[in-house]
């Protein structure tokens, strides 16, 4: 199969969409769940050795295939078997469009499948970091992007995408955004504070995954420079075991074990309560795009300390209140956290309102996801039915 079924387009505005990506990503689940709720037939193509955690929307189908074994050296036999298996899965699903989320591996799979039309949605590190790691990664990025029928980016990715080989006419701008009706300012949950023993303590919430990319170790080092009433909360969900163990050992060595709270699991529906519990939200990765975490924190009106990266500056550069710090700088991070923690309540409230207004104006998920949906119709040369006629 070398072509998709777009040629069979008719009056029906229900699309058949297949996705390659991490089936356990809350953001990808949000994306595919939205499309399924709009009446489209959505299928996740998942490697056989990949465990799909509970919570994938019931309206999203799962089709398994045997992916090639990614690593420093990829066996040609593995590539051939993976390509054949994915092509068979696509033949069973017969999508109008194949959308790979994340250039590395998932995008490569889309390219190797030979299926068209396919879309690559870039996430951040897959375009900012991975293509620079080896000549093979750079070559695969170029081949995948040049052959793609559309490449979805956020604005700060444009130059990196072009440098990696994406044709400019294929670039389209998207933002997942934040659900501003769900992520709102509100009172702190007394039950949540009591559950984690946080009475009388100030909370720094660091919601990114515990992996080397997100530099949670920097947050722990910064914590050692903050007053003893300050604690840091991090989610265990999707943590890399080695990195989690390293961070816990470092916290113990610094005498901070009782001030580092690793939360076992946070359901997406409960995230607003954790943001509201936070006196400050911190996000200091090495690389980032238009972080949904950042947008959710702003939508909840929380003070924010973030890495000074182009994608972050795009949203926060002109906004008074959020603190931007260099990558891998615990001292600067600690100083920024201290300033944010010491904000007077009236200043905190005013700046929180401004931050939320930015998200409501520019990243309301109801609009951003609808805009993303319209790009699929654009690619197929089809016009969706008017709202309300579905």
Where does each model-flagged region fall?
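Short hydrophobic beta-strand element within catalytic cores of glycosyltransferases
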Residues: 303-306, 313
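Nucleotide-activated donor-binding/catalytic signature segment of Leloir-type glycosyltransferases, i.e.
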Residues: 245-265
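N-terminal subdomain of nucleotide-sugar transferases
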Residues: 1-58, 224, 366, 384-390
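Short alpha-helical donor nucleotide-sugar binding micro-motif in glycosyltransferases
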Residues: 90, 265-266, 273-278
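Aromatic "clamp/platform" in nucleotide-sugar-dependent glycosyltransferases that forms part
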Residues: 286
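Glycosyltransferase donor-sugar binding loop
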Residues: 50, 178, 231-248
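Conserved donor-binding/catalytic core segment of Leloir-type glycosyltransferases
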Residues: 151, 197-214, 220-227, 233
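Conserved acidic donor-binding segment of nucleotide-sugar-dependent glycosyltransferases
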Residues: 318-331, 339-345
């Amino acid at each position: 199969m070398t072509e998709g079924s777009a040629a069979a387009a008719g009056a029906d505005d229900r699309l058949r969409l297949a996705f390659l990506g991490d089936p356990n990503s809350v953001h990808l689940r949000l994306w595919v769940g939205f499309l399924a709720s709009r009446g489209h037939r959505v299928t996740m193509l998942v490697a056989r050795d990949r465990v799909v955690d509970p919570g994938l929307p019931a309206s999203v189908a799962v089709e398994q295939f045997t992916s090639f074994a990614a690593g420093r050296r990829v066996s040609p036999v593995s590539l051939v078997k993976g390509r054949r298996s994915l092509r068979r899965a696509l033949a069973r699903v017969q999508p109008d469009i194949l959308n790979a989320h994340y250039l590395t591996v998932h995008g490569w799979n889309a390219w190797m499948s030979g299926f068209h039309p396919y879309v690559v949605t870039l996430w951040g590190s897959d375009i900012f970091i991975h293509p620079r790691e080896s000549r093979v990664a750079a070559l695969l990025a170029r081949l995948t992007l040049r052959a793609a029928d559309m490449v979805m980016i956020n604005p700060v990715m444009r130059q990196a995408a072009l440098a990696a080989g994406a044709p400019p006419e294929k670039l389209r701008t998207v933002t997942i955004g934040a659900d501003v009706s769900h992520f709102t300012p509100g009172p702190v949950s007394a039950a949540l504070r009591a559950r984690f023993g946080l009475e009388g303590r100030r909370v720094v919430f660091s919601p990114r995954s515990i992996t080397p990319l997100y530099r949670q170790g920097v947050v722990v080092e910064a914590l050692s420079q903050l007053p003893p009433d300050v604690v840091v909360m991090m989610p265990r969900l999707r943590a890399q075991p080695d990195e989690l163990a390293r961070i816990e050992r470092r916290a113990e060595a610094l005498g901070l074990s009782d001030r580092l709270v690793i939360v076992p699991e946070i359901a997406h529906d409960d995230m607003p309560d954790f943001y509201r519990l936070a006196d400050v939200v911190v996000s200091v990765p090495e690389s980032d795009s238009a972080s949904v975490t950042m947008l959710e924190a702003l939508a909840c009106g929380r003070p924010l300390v973030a890495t000074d990266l182009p994608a972050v500056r795009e949203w926060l550069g002109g906004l008074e209140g959020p603190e931007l710090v260099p990558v891998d700088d615990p001292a600067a991070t600690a100083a920024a956290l201290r300033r944010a923690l010491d904000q007077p309540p009236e200043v905190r409230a005013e700046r929180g309102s401004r931050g939320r207004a930015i998200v409501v104006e520019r990243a309301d998920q109801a609009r951003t996801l609808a805009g993303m949906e319209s790009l699929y119709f654009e690619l197929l040369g089809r016009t969706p039915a008017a709202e309300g006629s579905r």
